[in-house]
Amino acid sequence: MVLMNKRLKIILTNDDGITAKGMSCLVSALLEANIGDIYIAAPQAEQSGKSMAISLNQVVCASPYAYPQPVKEAWAVGGSPTDCVRLGLRTLFESVSPDLVISGINCGNNICKNAWYSGTIGAAKQALVDGIPSMALSQDNHISFFQQDKAPEILKALVIYLLSQPFPCLTGLNINFPTSPGGSSWEGMRLVPPGDEFFYEEPQYLGSVNKNQYYVGKISGVRIGEHPSEELACMLENHISVSPIFSQNSPIGLMTLEEFQKTQENFNASLLSSELTTKIF
């Protein structure tokens, strides 16, 4: 495994808002891992489901924020998660020369096709657009299931892995932590391709006033084929799922199945056998 030879400059963002518990959990884990200096540019209010939406022809206010944990600098942004990353990389922290963007920790999973809607993942994709490696972190079900004691070493190992450039182009990682049954520990990590399942939502009718109809979106089920995808199966089997977020579009894909399987083998050989993770799983 490639080891870091410098202290990183890390920008954090999310889609649950700067005051969210998931952000606090992430900051705590990174402070304990002690791998870099932390800068925050996060929405001042919840921005879930914004994907890569940006505020065009709209004024976006960024306000200094006194974050309650010891970070280098923090800003609350009146915009989307993607707005936060654009401002962070191009304006607020431009002089810092950031090495990494981490988005999360989202309250609820972002796996399979639902990842397309995620503001958490949208922020990570924006970092890739700007040429910066990124990670999107999500906790299945609720942030209260996040295993804080194991997080520092897991995040450190994943950051080292990501910065070793294991893919043929600039790549992010979509990382989802399972809800462990009965409070048991996570059993391991797997590198998996993104799944095809779709957690669909149905517009719920709330009523009408003066001919105006009001609806709210609610997740009402999941479409699963005959066999669960590797990504979904990974979560169901109490393993942390790690799937790539590629920075390039291609009509034929960036990797063959055989090439991806080789990358999976290297993930197991390098990351899961490292001193950082053998004492966890």
Curated annotation (Swiss-Prot):
UniProt keyword annotations, A-Z: Cytoplasm, Hydrolase, Metal-binding, Nucleotide-binding
Cofactor details (free text): Binds 1 divalent metal cation per subunit.
Pfam family, one: SurE
Location in the cell: Cytoplasm
Keyword Ribosomal protein (UniProt): no
Superkingdom of the organism of origin: Bacteria
EC number: 3.1.3.5
Main EC class the enzyme belongs to: hydrolase
GO function terms (MF aspect): 3'-nucleotidase activity; 5'-nucleotidase activity; exopolyphosphatase activity; metal ion binding; nucleotide binding
Keyword Metal-binding: yes
Function: Nucleotidase that shows phosphatase activity on nucleoside 5'-monophosphates.
The protein, known as: 5'-nucleotidase SurE
Species per Swiss-Prot/TrEMBL record: Chlamydia pneumoniae (Chlamydophila pneumoniae)
Lineage of producing organism: Bacteria, Pseudomonadati, Chlamydiota, Chlamydiia, Chlamydiales
